[in-house]
Amino acid sequence: MTTQLTNDAHRHIGVMPAYPFYGGAPVNPDMSARATLAELIADLDREGTERALVLPNYGVPDAKVSFGFNQLVLEAAAKDDRISCGLWVSPRPQDAEMTAKALELAGEPGVKALKTSFLLGGSVEDPECQAQLDNMFAVAREHDLVVHFHTSPGAASDIDKVGQLVDKYGDDAKIHLVHFGGGISGHIKLISSRFFDWIEAGKQVYTDTSWAVGFAPRWLASEIERRGIGHDRVLFASDEPWGDYAGEAARLAAATGDGELGRLMFADNFTTLYGK
């Protein structure tokens, strides 16, 4: 585990109700979820996290839960200058009213990002989601916000799907691909060429290595060094409570070492993207 102070570019706050995921009994897999700012700050202090981008927790198929956490992240950003926040928004047409209200908060102090996912429904290719996506990116451009998209193998979160958003919107909006593709297929597609092709094409694409399979951070660091680009596009993220801070930090530190690349990913890239 790294002993340096870190900046965490993607973590969550909010305790969700138990839910019977995948047909099982109601559970709370995110067992370290935090309900209060005091609990969150205690975690930051224990970890040595100097600054953090905090986002509403999500995962249960009830959009109102995550939208309800928008006020919590705004309060966190207002009360502690170590914390910036992102607002939960949704591409689903049935959530359009709640998304519109959330986007009205984009100019509030401390708001640096918008967070969304297709895990709860919708698709990049669904025409009924297009108006919401256009609105999200219009607001992101207006307020210079970073749009965070969940990526993982399969279905609507696959990098082949989410990557279409980089192609369409990445020229003039910043996009953070959370979890670097989320699995082996996404890692290989991105590291072998796609991530670097986007950068060379002028796309404003960023990512992190949370949830990454063991080989990926090593290979990514090696390709960045070999190609000489991408060092300013990767940020450390714990994804707490769905990720594990200690594990994520140790894996990235092992891949990047204690030199310039490690410093950029653990600290400086966050400052460049989100300000001091």
What is each model feature region?
Residues 2-9, 13-51, 141, 229-235, ...:
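Mid-to-C-terminal alpha-helical segments outside catalytic/metal-binding sites
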Residues 7-11, 52-54, 84-89, 112-116, ...:
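Hydrophobic faces of well-ordered beta-strands that scaffold small-molecule active sites
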Residues 12-14, 57, 88-92, 117-121, ...:
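Active-site beta-loop-alpha junctions enriched in small/polar residues
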Residues 17-22, 98-99, 161-162, 187-191, ...:
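Short aromatic-enriched loop/helix-cap "lid" or pocket-rim segments at secondary-structure transitions
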Residues 22-31, 61-65, 123-127, 184-190:
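Short, flexible/disordered intra-domain loops and linkers
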Residues 37-44, 70-74, 99-103, 133, ...:
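Generic structural signal for well-ordered alpha-helices
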Residues 50-51, 60-154, 201-203, 276:
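Active-site gating/metal-coordination segments in enzymes
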Residues 125-235:
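Catalytic pocket-lining loop regions of alpha/beta-barrel enzymes
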